[in-house]
Regions:
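Bergerat-fold GHKL ATPase/HATPase_c domain
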Residues: 1-51, 59, 74-81, 497-525
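Interdomain "switch/hinge" adjacent to the Bergerat
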Residues: 1-6, 38, 42-93, 119-285, ...
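Conserved phosphate/pyrophosphate-binding and hydrolysis machinery centered on Walker-type P-loop NTPases
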Residues: 17, 21, 97, 489
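Alpha-helical scaffold elements adjacent to nucleotide-binding pockets in ATP/GTP-utilizing enzyme cores
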Residues: 24-27, 75-82, 103-107, 187-191, ...
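Glycine-rich phosphate-binding loop
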Residues: 89-108
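Short, solvent-exposed loop/turn segments at the edges of secondary structure
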Residues: 106, 163-165, 324
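Glycine-rich ATP-binding loops of the HATPase_c
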Residues: 110-114
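Charged regulatory segments coupled to nucleotide-binding catalytic modules in large multidomain enzymes
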Residues: 249-525
C-alpha cells in the first residue's frame, strides 16, 4: 500500500503560498462560508455577523474569530485534522479543498483552533505544534507518514462553554520573526482592503450605481463585516485619481461615471460581469492609487493581484493598458474555479470561454477607449496651444516684449505652425465626435475631455491696458524688450539684447523666458 510522506504537509503549509498574508484570506473565506450557513439557519442576523481580527505585535499573537456556525464537538477533531477531504460544495462555497486551515501553522509556534456549536456546552480545541512541524520537516533522518506526522503534532481537548455561544476562532501563537509582516497592522489592512470580501467605502459615490446594476440583473456581491483591531474594512475606491507618491494631493483625473459589461458563454450562461470607471484617461494611474487596475474576483475575494489581468497578453494588448483603469470583474459561473493558490482559475472549458469573452472587452474595447481619449485630448490641446500662443504673441507685440527681430520672427513662425495644427485638429474632433455618437463609453469620454478644454474668456481677450500700451509703444517707436530699459543708452540696450539672444539659444524656452524676465525686472529697477 502506497504511503504519503511528510513532505506533503510541507507542500500544504510552508511551501503553499508565496505571500504570507494569504493566511488571512484563507481563514476569512472559511469564516465567510460559515457565516452564510449561520444566516441561512437563522443562527445569526446578517447585520450582526462579523469576522474579527486582532493583531497583538508585542505578544506576537494573531486571533481571527467569527460568530457563525461553529463546529459540533463530535465532528471537530476529524474536521480539523483531515487534510484535503473537505465536504464543502465547490459550486457554492468559497473554501472547498480542506487545506486552507493549515495556512497558518508554518508561520507560528502554535496554531490553535477553538469552536463552540450552538446548543452544546463545550468548547472544542485543537493545537498544531508549528515549531515541531518545522523541526521534523528540516530533519532529513525523520520520515513519518503524513497521517502519523499530523497525529504527532496535534493535541485536542475540551473546555466548558455557554450553550448559547456559537463561534470559531483561530489563534496563531508565537508568530515567528521571519513572518513579522503578519503582525504589521497597516500592511495587513492594506492587503485585506484589496483582497477580502468587504463593502465599498462610503465615500465611493458610484457604489450605489453598482448595487443598482446588481439588483436589476439578479446579481449579488458577497460582503461581510470584517474588523482589524476594531476598525471595519472597506474597499478604498475613490473618485479622484492622484499623481506622485503616497500622500500627494495633486489630482490629475477623476472618475466621472461607471460603465458595466456582462460576459456570456455560447450556451447563454452568464460567466461574469464587470464595472469600470470612466475618466479622461489622462495618464497611467500611479501605484499610490490603491485600487488601480481591473481586478478579478470570485465571491468578492480577489483572484491574484492588481497585475493578474494586466500582465497577461491574453487580456491586454499593451502591458500598460490595465493601469489606465479602475474596476472589477466578478466571476459568477460555478465552473470558474479558483486554483489552490487563488491566483487564477483552474484550466477547463469554461475558463477558456471566459478568457475569449473578457478579451473582447479588455483587449479591444478598453484599448480603443484610452487611445481614443489620447487622440481627443491632443486635438483639443492643439486648439488650446494655438489660443495661448496667439495671446502671448499679441501681448509681446503690444508691450514690445520681443528681444529682437529674430525672436519676433521665430514666435510668428511658431504661431503659424500652431495655427496649422489647430486647423487640422478641427477635422479630428469632428471625426472623434462621430465615433462618440455611436458609442456610449466614448461619448462620455469625449464630453468629459471637451468640457475640460472649454476656453476661458480671460485666455482669449487682450486687455484694454494692453491695447493702450501698444499705442504708447508705437508713438515712442518701441519694438523690442530692451527699449523699455530707458535708463540705458542704445548701445547698452543692444548689448543686453545680445545677452538675451544668447540665453534663448542655449536654454530651453521656458527657462530662457524666465531668466530674461528676471534680468529685465532687475535692470528696470
Amino acid at each position: 500500500m502506497a504511503e504519503i510522506g511528510k513532505n506533503v504537509i510541507e507542500n500544504l503549509t510552508t511551501a503553499m503560498y508565496e505571500n504570507a498574508y494569504t493566511v488571512y484570506r484563507e481563514y476569512i473565506q472559511n469564516s465567510a462560508d460559515s457565516i452564510d450557513k449561520a444566516i441561512a439557519a437563522g443562527i445569526v442576523n446578517e447585520k450582526d455577523a462579523i469576522i474579527d481580527i486582532n493583531i497583538e505585535y508585542n505578544k506576537r499573537r494573531i486571533t481571527i474569530n467569527d460568530n457563525a456556525m461553529g463546529i459540533p464537538a463530535e465532528m471537530f477533531v476529524k474536521k480539523l485534522t483531515d487534510i484535503a477531504d473537505s465536504q464543502k460544495d465547490r459550486t457554492k462555497e468559497k473554501g472547498f479543498r480542506g487545506i486552507g486551515r493549515l495556512a497558518g501553522v508554518g508561520y507560528c509556534d502554535t496554531l490553535i483552533f477553538k469552536s463552540s456549536y450552538k446548543g452544546e456546552n463545550v468548547e472544542s480545541v485543537i493545537e498544531w505544534d508549528g515549531k515541531k512541524l518545522r523541526d521534523v520537516l528540516a530533519d532529513t533522518t525523520q520520515h513519518p507518514s503524513a497521517s502519523d506526522f499530523v497525529d504527532d503534532i496535534t493535541y485536542s481537548y475540551q473546555n466548558e462553554a455557554n450553550m448559547d455561544e456559537h463561534y470559531f476562532e483561530v489563534i496563531m501563537e508565537g508568530v515567528i520573526p521571519e513572518s513579522d509582516d503578519l503582525l504589521d497592522k497597516v500592511a495587513v489592512i492594506e492587503y485585506l482592503e484589496s483582497v477580502a470580501p468587504i463593502p465599498f467605502a462610503t465615500f465611493f459615490i458610484y457604489k450605489s450605481k453598482i448595487y443598482e446594476f446588481c439588483r436589476n440583473n439578479n446579481l449579488k456581491i458577497d460582503e461581510y463585516t470584517i474588523q482589524v483591531n476594531g476598525n471595519q474594512l472597506f474597499k478604498p475606491y475613490k473618485t479622484k485619481i492622484y499623481d506622485g507618491t503616497s500622500g500627494s494631493t495633486k489630482v490629475v483625473d477623476e472618475i466621472k461615471d461607471v460603465e458595466f459589461k456582462e460576459f456570456y458563454a455560447s450556451d447563454g450562461r452568464r460567466l461574469a460581469w464587470m464595472w469600470f470607471g470612466i475618466s479622461k484617461f489622462e495618464q497611467q494611474i500611479k501605484p499610490m492609487n490603491k485600487m488601480r487596475g481591473i481586478r478579478l474576483r470570485k465571491e468578492n475575494i480577489q483572484i491574484g493581484d492588481e497585475n493578474t489581468l494586466g500582465a497577461s497578453p491574453k487580456f491586454f494588448k499593451e502591458p500598460r493598458g490595465n493601469c489606465y483603469f479602475v474596476g472589477e470583474i466578478y466571476a459568477v459561473d460555478s465552473e470558474l474555479i479558483p486554483n489552490a493558490r487563488r491566483d487564477y482559475f483552474k484550466t477547463n472549458a469554461t475558463t477558456k470561454e471566459f478568457e475569449v469573452e473578457v478579451r473582447k472587452v479588455l483587449y479591444n474595447e478598453l484599448y480603443k477607449t484610452y487611445h481614443y481619449a489620447n487622440q481627443v485630448k491632443k486635438a483639443f490641446q492643439s486648439q488650446t496651444d494655438y489660443e495661448r500662443k496667439a495671446v502671448e504673441y499679441d501681448k509681446k507685440v503690444s508691450e514690445a516684449g520681443f528681444v529682437d527681430e529674430r525672436d519676433k520672427e521665430k514666435a510668428k513662425k511658431d504661431l503659424e505652425t500652431a495655427k496649422e495644427k489647430a486647423e487640422k485638429s478641427v477635422r479630428t474632433i469632428e471625426l472623434r465626435e462621430q465615433d462618440a455618437n455611436e458609442n456610449t463609453t466614448l461619448n462620455r469620454v469625449f464630453n468629459e475631455i471637451k468640457e475640460s478644454y472649454r476656453p476661458e474668456k480671460s485666455n482669449t481677450v487682450i486687455s484694454v491696458d494692453s491695447v493702450k500700451q501698444e499705442e504708447k509703444n508705437k508713438k515712442e517707436d518701441k519694438k523690442y524688450l530692451t527699449q523699455n530699459l530707458s535708463k540705458y543708452n542704445k548701445r547698452e540696450q543692444k548689448l543686453i539684447s545680445k545677452v538675451y539672444s544668447i540665453l534663448q539659444a542655449i536654454l530651453p524656452k521656458d527657462m530662457a523666458d524666465m531668466v530674461v524676465a528676471k534680468i529685465q525686472e532687475e535692470l528696470s529697477k
